[in-house]
Amino acid sequence: MAKLSKKAKAIAAAVDKNKLYTVAEAIALVREYATSKFDETIELAVNLGVDPRHADQMVRGVVTLPKGTGKNVRVGVFARGPKAEEAKAAGAEVVGAEDLMEAIQGGSIDFDRCIATPDMMGVVGRLGKILGPKGMMPNPKLGTVTMNVADAVKAAKGGQVEYRVDRTGIIHSGIGKASFSAEDIRANFDALIDALLKAKPAGAKGRYVKKVAISSTMGPGVSIDIADLPAAA
């Protein structure tokens, strides 16, 4: 069995795996032990009391993190004519139509978020098997199939993140960087939790929020006391 490094031992001693921390305590611990040479992402994991195999228990949506994500989000847009120019002016890195489809089919996906005008969905639909598994397929319910491409591009770059429960009932989402202040991480934490509470499906039974944990990319997971969340949780 590999020996623990001094850093790992210090972290193990500082974070009690059997303890539930307040949100403020958890954020402080995660920031303190995010000591890698790169700016680690602060990640939130929320275990929900839903069974996503049932359509009436799916939890999915978008939320704008008020303090941003700390990431440079590259945006790809399927559009033609004036809408293509609008997307470029708004800051989209990749804009195209059939040419963009062919590039993606060839293995080139040079963006993090994908937006399309409604008239382009016939083209985008051919990419379902490629974009779908990556969570990049444009969706009108998420505001990524729209004629308001400028607003959609700006939202994607301005801190908007998509969330979707996985097959085990857990939502995973980045809520900032270790370089963020504790206050900024808390603001983003609150925004995402609020969005998840509002997205509670009618089919959910029993306790909705079962477990919450926060961590950094290379750091330990810190469990949060659900009693420290809004009453609706």
From Swiss-Prot:
Gene3D superfamilies linked: 3.30.190.20, 3.40.50.790
Pfam family, one: Ribosomal_L1
GO BP field: regulation of translation; translation
InterPro entries in the record: Ribosom_uL1_bac-type (IPR005878), Ribosomal_uL1 (IPR002143), Ribosomal_uL1-like (IPR023674), Ribosomal_uL1/biogenesis (IPR028364), Ribosomal_uL1_3-a/b-sand (IPR016095), Ribosomal_uL1_CS (IPR023673)
Family membership noted in the UniProt record: Belongs to the universal ribosomal protein uL1 family.
Subunit structure: Part of the 50S ribosomal subunit.
MF term (GO), any: rRNA binding
Extent of the signal sequence: none
One Gene Ontology term, aspect cellular component: cytosolic large ribosomal subunit
The protein's name: Large ribosomal subunit protein uL1
Biological function: Binds directly to 23S rRNA. The L1 stalk is quite mobile in the ribosome, and is involved in E site tRNA release.
Keywords, alphabetical: Repressor, Ribonucleoprotein, Ribosomal protein, RNA-binding, rRNA-binding, Translation regulation, tRNA-binding
Cross-referenced SUPFAM superfamilies: Ribosomal protein L1
